Structures are given as structure tokens and as C-alpha cells.
Amino acid sequence: MGEPVTLVLGLGREVGNAVARTFQDEGHRILVADPLEERLESARDALEDGAATYHGELHSRLGLRNAITAALEAFGRIDNAVIIPEIEDGDQLLDFAQEKFEKALARSARGAALALRVIAERLLEQEDLPQAGVQRIPQKGTITFVLGYAAIASMPGRFTESVGQHAILGVMKAGALELAEHAIRVNAVIAIRPREERSESWTARRVPLGRAAKSDEIAEAVRYIASPQAAYLTGQSLVLDGGRSTLSGMLD
């Protein structure tokens, strides 16, 4: 079969389902993976028949290899991976728990680095799909991280989240340089996402467009980054912040 295969590693609250749907609508075969069965059940309801799932942790080499093996058993290959790390709970520098902090960094920085390595190893083992559609330089595969706004800007009460998201962004940039010679592109989508504790007034005063990014908007950005039309894009972050990073201060 000539359809590309996309892995979605981590579903988050809504974004993972939107990403999987968007790629499926583009004709991709899909495997979604998450440690929480209820999220996988939601994904099964959201996706068309034919999507595969993997239930297990995704922060170790073994867990990642198991997810890739599930994709290979279902579809025979992988072409794109979308990684959606967990958002850590709020805490502060002066009172964070050291053990919890260390585990969070292991999940973020180490988990991101392991994901790049394990996925890249598989991409390098397989033959490329025949080129179709728009003519671009062939790509071996793509890996895209979906990060929160804490990857580029911090705020009080979000210490561990900010450190972890910044660390993943560093892994993305360093990994993109390492894998460029192999035609594997690595990028990130950074978005202001809805949060349960954030009121509408927060975004109205701080975001020129007055709202957070929608899951479908994030998914479309990921789809573009993984497409042949973006074959010259690597090591970059596409920021969906409604103009927030351009604004000095707050709106009236």
C-alpha cells in the first residue's frame, strides 16, 4: 500500500484526536498511542475504521519500540510521528518536590530524545514511499512535537512545566541538526491551548486575537509541517499564539 503512516504519540486532552483525524482525512493510516485507556477509547470514537491503537507508556525505549512495533504489525512502516508531551501540573521554584521534578524532566527531555532516536532508527531502516503529488525533494520522514506556550514563555506558578517544555524544544532543535543529513525533518508547533484554570478574560487581555488556539487549527499546522510542501522546513517552531508574542504588555 502506498498510503503514508502517521503515529500520534500521546493524545493530550483534545489535540491528539484532532491531529489523528486531520491526517486520516489526508489519506494517512494512523496509529494513536497513549498510556490512558480512556483517551484511546475517545480516539477510537473520533476516528474512522482502520486506525490502530497502542496502550502503554511512551517515555522509555521499550515503550516507544513497542508502539512502533504495533504500527509495523498494523501497517508495515511509519512515515511521520507527532509527539504530544504531557503538560505538567503547576508548581513554583521555592516549593517544588525534587523527586517529582526529576521524574518530570525524565519524561520531557529524556523522553523526547529517546523518541527522536527510536523513530529515526526505524525511518532509516525502511524504503521511501514512491513520490506523488507536488514535486519536492524526497524526505525520509518527519517528527513533529506539539508544545504549549510554556516552551517559549514562562509565568509564575508553572516552573516544572516551563523547564520541561523548554527542554523538549532544545531536543527538537538539536535533533533536527543531527537528522538533517538523513532527510528526516524535526519541527514543533507551539500553541496557546485552552486550559481549565484559564478564564476567557485571560486571553482577551493578553492575546490580540482574543482566544486560545483551537485543536483543529493546531492539527492543520502539524499536517502542513509534515507534508512535502514543507520539505525545506526543519529545526523550526510554528507558533500559534494569536499575536501574543508580538504584544508588549496587555490589552485594555
Placement of each model-derived feature along the sequence:
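Canonical Rossmann dinucleotide-binding motif of NAD(H)/NADP(H)-dependent dehydrogenases/reductases
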Residues: M1-L31
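Substrate-binding pocket helix/loop in short-chain dehydrogenase/reductase
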Residues: Q92-L93, A97-L105, T203
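Alpha-helical segment proximal to the catalytic Tyr-Lys
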Residues: E121, L177-E178, A231
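Catalytic loop of short-chain dehydrogenase/reductase
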Residues: D128-I168, M172-E181, R193
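Short, small/polar-rich loop/turn modules that mediate ligand/substrate recognition or access, typified
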Residues: A180, R185, L233-G235
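A conserved structural motif in NAD(P)-dependent oxidoreductases
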Residues: V207-I218, Q229
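Short C-terminal tail/terminal secondary-structure segment
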Residues: T234-D252
